[in-house]
């Protein structure tokens, strides 16, 4: 939490707008802002709302250059569960996939595209009880005229309970855990915006390019 805010302060960007429905992390963001601005000759402009993205006042936002988000995966990322104001979290408010998609996920993306030139969304298809929900495809289908492509983002392995790594006798198998943690995990970042070639610098050239 707070990594995107930290990245903003480390960059040349001048303004940052964000939101978080968790009052605890919201307070920590205010502390981050205060501490980071102490190191700068000119404080940066930052505004964060204590609400979910579905309640963000988009009409009050200026034109945005770049929006980056990783919406809580349906029925997977249950942030602040059991905490203060958990009822404001998307997993609590949108507890069925169709409702999550139609009232939260896609409308938030649509509102974002109205104010932002580029939108980058980190999301994977959640698999619940053996059923894969194709969140990525649904996002691309919704904004296919603005779809620019996707990049892979390497991530740390998500923590899991030790019981997942028990052997046949039910005993914890550290070697099994180490093997799992040493694997490389990649998640998609879906890219949207006006037509442009964002990936030309990383594309491998071939002789065909000369003809």
Give the ranges of each region predicted by the language model.
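Class I S-adenosyl-L-methionine-dependent methyltransferase catalytic core
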Residues: 1-211
């Amino acid at each position: 939490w707070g990594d995107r805010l930290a990245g903003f302060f480390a960059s040349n960007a001048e303004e940052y707008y964000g939101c978080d429905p968790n009052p605890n992390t919201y307070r920590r963001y205010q502390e981050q802002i205060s501490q980071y601005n102490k190191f700068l000759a000119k404080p940066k402009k930052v505004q964060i709302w204590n609400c979910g993205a579905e309640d963000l006042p988009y009409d009050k936002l200026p034109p945005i250059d770049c929006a980056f988000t990783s919406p809580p995966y349906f029925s997977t990322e249950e942030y602040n569960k059991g905490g203060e104001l958990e009822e404001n979290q998307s997993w609590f408010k949108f507890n069925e996939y169709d409702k999550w998609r139609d009232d939260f996920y896609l409308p938030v993306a649509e509102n974002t595209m109205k104010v932002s030139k580029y939108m980058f969304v980190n999301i994977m298809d959640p698999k619940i009880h053996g059923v894969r929900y194709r969140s990525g495809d649904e996002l691309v289908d919704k904004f296919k005229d603005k779809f620019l492509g996707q990049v892979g983002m390497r991530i740390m392995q998500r923590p899991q309970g030790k019981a997942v790594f028990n052997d046949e006798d039910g005993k914890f198998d550290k070697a099994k855990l180490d093997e799992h943690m040493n694997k490389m995990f990649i998640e998609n970042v879906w890219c949207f915006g006006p037509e442009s070639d964002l990936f030309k610098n990383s594309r491998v050239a071939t002789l065909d390019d000369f003809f």
